[in-house]
Amino acid sequence: MAQPEDKAPEVPTEGVRLVPPQVNKADRTPLGVLSTLEPLTRLQRTWGVWHVPELDTQDAEALVGLWPLGSFLVTGRDPSQALVLRSGPLPGEVNTYQIQKIPRGVSLESSNLCMPDLPHLLAFLSASRDVLPRTLLLPPPTLGPRDEHTDPVQIGRVQQDTPGKVLSIVNQLYLETHRGWGREQTPQETEPEAAQRHDPAPRNPAPHGVSWVKGPLSPEVDHPGPALASLLEEEEEDLEGKEEGREDDPEEEGPEDVLTIHVQSLVRARSSYVARQYRSLRVRIASDSGGPHGSGDPATELLQDVRHLLTDLQDHLAKDSYIRAVFGSRGPGLPKKDEDPGPALETAVCQAVLAPLKPALWTRLRTLRAPELRRLRRRQTALRAGAGPPGAQGPGPEGQSPAPALRSRIHERLAHLHAACAPRRKVALLLEVCRDVYAGLARGENQDPLGADAFLPALTEELIWSPDIGDTQLDVEFLMELLDPDELRGEAGYYLTTWFGALHHIAHYQPETDRAPRGLSSEARASLHQWHRRRTLHRKDHPRAQANLPFKEPWAEETVTGTSDN
């Protein structure tokens, strides 16, 4: 005897099509099988899983044949769509049904039942088989709310639900396209994303992972599946990775890529807090008026505003449940330093928010610093003329400069440093340049190690022969304002002040007397001390008071009387 759930309804007379009444305000149809929204909601949330428009019918039948009874896929695009169903336990028991588009909705071929749209039709067929040999088996709500005892969803990886004996794959491309569905977000952030709900076509045709599998796979079939994390990495360009020219472990970069995509989606959602802050930053960069942190210097004020906005966004996004879930998907056993999502979140915010505005930001900084940068380049040209050919009077032992190959590598790193966006990435490249400078000082055999006294003049010479000293100056200023205060207390802060000193020597070179300053002036030292205090002193009672202290740049101090720039 047929089970109640498999019992077919009475078929209307030939030529008459059963059409349910209009959907009411609660999005429910009067049909008893759709008295609950759970099947319909599950189908809507997993649309990108069961609908694979680029898959042909033959391949779909081969895939569905490996899955449990009732498993299905929808292939093709409107109006040439087909339902592929695993209808029996024997190999090859897979049926294909054409989906017809009619004025009142959609229906299966040879069926007299019409539903408003495809999800409603599939939801009905999951409860009543109509003309099908059996009801549909819906995919699990992988992207919906999870039981509090389950493990975090493994983004882009195979995950097994032991109690339910379900093997599933979270579709990364689906997450990107339908970001607003299974994650809890603020109302203003989910509203624009919901508009994408009924656009089932993925942006790029890509190998489609198995959506759900109950029980073991057929032992006769070798079923390797591409890692969805790798598909995502091929689709999303890692700008900083291209700048560095290195290949990192994709597993390590995965969470940063996913976070970046999520933040980018929030930037596109115009009513979200992230989008509003992004627009505010764009307006601030283009504005001639000063910011709220009036230090007196327009360029410094602009960078302070950028820092406060990025910090505010990171604090806001750190509370995002989706971001916590993505970072938690990396699993247990991580080193203690990797448990903090701060570095990955900083990279994501810089890539999604700061990188699109970076050309405008640097154009604005060059405009604000134009007179000082011209003077710096004139001093650089004068120093080059006095030094002769590159390497003729280097600071190394016996007047030797770094080898040409090493100097070329230093210049390449300086270019990468300027192209980088995130402060941590810039600092990493700056420290690489420092290591190269030290390597140039220790070229000779049996040579005693050289310390900071030799490093400063060596770095100064490299900057003298740098093709883009103006960009390097702005990079140093950028880092001095945007780098995390904890970083400034360590190695990064020490070398930043050293670069400040080297640029100070070049900016205050006196071509008339052919003499560079022997050390930092008292004004420059006081300015450095004030900057360090402002950036590293935490005051809980006045968290923003430190931003109001002015900071004089290396060029702000006038040179010795008698020096003229005209």
Curated annotation (Swiss-Prot):
It holds the Pfam family VPS9. Residues 388-397 have a biased composition (Gly residues). Residues 370-515 form the VPS9 domain. Its main location: other. The keyword Secreted does not apply. It is found in: Cell projection, Ruffle; Cytoplasmic vesicle. One of its GO terms (cellular component) is actin cytoskeleton. One of its GO terms (biological process) is protein transport. Interacts with RAB5A, RAB22A and MUSK. This is Ras and Rab interactor-like protein. Residues 232-256 have a biased composition (Acidic residues). Gene3D superfamilies: VPS9 domain. InterPro entries: SH2_dom_sf (IPR036860), VPS9 (IPR003123), Vps9-like (IPR045046), VPS9_dom_sf (IPR037191). Keywords: Cell projection, Cytoplasmic vesicle, Endocytosis, GTPase activation, Protein transport, Transport. The gene is RINL. Residues 532-542 have a biased composition (Basic residues). Residues 182-257, 383-404, 532-566 are annotated as: Disordered. One of its GO terms (molecular function) is small GTPase binding. Guanine nucleotide exchange factor (GEF) for RAB5A and RAB22A that activates RAB5A and RAB22A by exchanging bound GDP for free GTP. Plays a role in endocytosis via its role in activating Rab family members. SUPFAM superfamilies: SH2 domain, VPS9 domain.
